[in-house]
Amino acid sequence: MPENFGAMRQDGLVSTSESDSPAPAATPAATLRAEYSKLVEDIRHYRFAYYNEAESLVSDAEFDVLFRRLEEIEALHPELISNDSPTQEVGGEVSAAFTPVQHTSQIYSLEDVFSIEELQSWIIKAQANAEKLAGSIVAERPLRWLTELKIDGLAVNLLYRNGQLVRAATRGDGITGEDITHNVLTIQEIPRQLRGENLPEEVEIRGEVFIASKDFLALNEQIVGTGRAPFANPRNAAAGSLRQKDPADTAKRPLSMLVHGIGSRIGLDVASQSESYALLKAWGLPTSPYFKVLTGYQEVLDYINHYGEHRHDLLHEIDGIVIKIDDFASQNALGFTSRVPRWAVAYKYPPEEVHTKLLDILVNVGRTGRVTPFGVMEPVKVAGSTVEMATLHNQDVVKAKGVLIGDTVVLRKAGDVIPEIVGPVLALRDGREREFVMPTECPSCGTALAPAKEGDVDIRCPNAKSCPDQLRERVFHLAGRGAFDIEALGWEAAIALTQPAEPELAPVRNEAQIFNLVAEDLALVKIKREKKVKGVLSGVHELVPYFYSKGTEEKPSEPTSNTVKLFIELEKAKAQPLWRVLVALSIRHVGPTASRALATAFGSMAAIRAASEPELAEVDGVGPTIAAALIEWFAEDWHREIIDAWAADGVRMADERDESVRRTLAGLTIVVTGSLEKFNRDQAKEAIINRGGKSAGSVSKNTDYVVAGENAGTKLDKAEKLGVTVLDEAGFETLLAHGPDHSAEAEENESEGSTTND
């Protein structure tokens, strides 16, 4: 239990403070006693399921809230603290499924902080305590902070005697764990015999067993293929794999391990955490390449921010950053509470996985007719945003995930990635859940649904011309930033144009009409909108005009400012380059990359229409699938009518070629990473494509150049590993102007010029 509690956080929880202590409190009421007892019971239940059954009954974020509430009550009413309180224990209870073994020294948990402000307070407090308790040590050598990734895996304790692995155990309750030696021996990275000489007589080595992100995806695919429910996350998969009764089954799972500390030791003298890491690596144990020894708070903050941005580029899942005082003398001086060390803390990133209720599964009809199921959930906050819907892709995915309507589900939202329903929490089913059944008819137009061709997983509505939902989606798409870039034509405007509540005849019944609109066409359009009462949605819908103001006796109805903006932007959109027009047409498989390639190769819509399928397929970045989709699209009369109508309304259907731009990058694949001074990302991509090159989003052995600006990320690391030529911005400009030969020559000259003459 944390020693002191003070300032109230915005979320109502109490954070630690060095100077504040709990205020005297009245005798706890019966309701508070009942809440305390339930918290103790629930947390112990959730812990047992998490540590011993590889089952997450609540999300990590929910567990943290419950645990902090328990700590808050105990701080205000210490007389309530019971011996079986989770705050008095380190981890989960020991399962009866494996032989219990006692650790030589206790394995502690870590204190968690959830904000930068809390972390700063902890560091200030730890620094002050270190100066007070280990003043001479700190004066001689200022504190350094070993900062490392908090792997989201299963804690394991390895015991070596004279370099020989004699036992491996789970953390358990921190004092007693479960003997899993035979299963751990199946992990290839773990040596049975340590390397080197003068090995300690006995040493405990702590680490984390995990499944790498890419291996987890493959494992779940394999499991689903056998008809079983997939694992909810890599941590559960690792825990379940280590608890297999037969080591041969564990050996089939892609387990890995990284070690991060030393427990008890006999015959080993080491001065710091970082020194011990170097020793562990020399012994042949797998250590993390990501740890750093830092000297100040700002460096720690930079480390946290860096991996907060790049956490999904890593080998494994992380849920935070661990910060430790590096030297052991200071650690020993600070010591431990009953549960956590006073010299280490875990900063937890905002949760990316939460639990919520799956209320229903509905379907959406997309712009190319694809019918996609999506989950409707109780709104929940995850990764900084509130989510209440998530795609389920197709009926096979729904089946593979094993989700039922009414399930409590694990919802994941990683960074900018779209929210994903990972799977159900099976232990919380009560028998009232029901299966999702894919509709056989389009919910928008009633047309029979079917795969586009035999063997397709996706089912589609073939009524592209007349399906109202498909038209709405296409109109919304053509206004997007990657197409005509019409900001005033958003989702609600697309509904108003194609599916208004009034009038019965929509202003836009085919996207051919979009550039032929006049303001008067929109005067009577009304949509249904949820009414607000004092700024709060009421659940009551009303009919409101969308494109015109309501109007009064004094002031007649007139176009809104957004409607005026819409017509200005429609006029501006007519001058967009050819590739954007191609994107706006919603041709299946034809995205920005293929559209740019087609526009560069042919120069005009007429030339693209006249090209044969082999001619289209020969274009770099197009290929046979896209070529076939183009031929199929242009074969429809009503598709060609859209192009003709847009052309008649002034939309540009040919690019003015700048013959002065040489095709210096023909056949080259280039990746841009980081920030450039003279180019934003789109401008750099445009410059590459205009010169005949391919602008790729990821580095591979087929990449010719990587252009690295400021804050270049993992793409730069990968380029260096693969031996791909890396250019700075000046080198990129040389490459654009003169091509690869001149760029290589410039590099060689620069290299020669940097040598010194004796």
UniProtKB/Swiss-Prot annotation:
Domain of life of the organism encoding this protein: Bacteria
Catalytic activity: NAD(+) + (deoxyribonucleotide)n-3'-hydroxyl + 5'-phospho-(deoxyribonucleotide)m = (deoxyribonucleotide)n+m + AMP + beta-nicotinamide D-nucleotide
Domain BRCT: 660-749
Residues annotated to bind NAD(+): D60, A61, E62, F63, D64, S109, L110, E148, R171, E208, K324, K348
Residues forming the catalytic site: K150
Keywords recorded for this protein, A-Z: DNA damage, DNA repair, DNA replication, Ligase, Magnesium, Manganese, Metal-binding, NAD, Zinc
GO biological processes: DNA repair; DNA replication
CC terms in the record's Gene Ontology section: cytosol
PROSITE patterns associated with the record: BRCT, DNA_LIGASE_N1, DNA_LIGASE_N2
Record region (Disordered): 1-28, 735-758
Residue sites binding Zn(2+) per the record: C442, C445, C461, C467
Enzyme kind, highest EC tier: ligase
GO molecular function, one term: DNA ligase (NAD+) activity
Record-annotated disulphide pairs: none
Cofactor(s) listed in the protein's UniProt record: Mg(2+); Mn(2+)
Enzyme Commission code(s) on record: 6.5.1.2
Family designation: Belongs to the NAD-dependent DNA ligase family. LigA subfamily.
Role: DNA ligase that catalyzes the formation of phosphodiester linkages between 5'-phosphoryl and 3'-hydroxyl groups in double-stranded DNA using NAD as a coenzyme and as the energy source for the reaction. It is essential for DNA replication and repair of damaged DNA.
UniProt xrefs under HAMAP family: DNA_ligase_A (MF_01588)
PANTHER family per record: CHROMOSOME TRANSMISSION FIDELITY FACTOR 18, DNA LIGASE
Protein name: DNA ligase
Natural source organism: Renibacterium salmoninarum (strain ATCC 33209 / DSM 20767 / JCM 11484 / NBRC 15589 / NCIMB 2235)
Taxonomic lineage of the native organism: Bacteria, Bacillati, Actinomycetota, Actinomycetes, Micrococcales
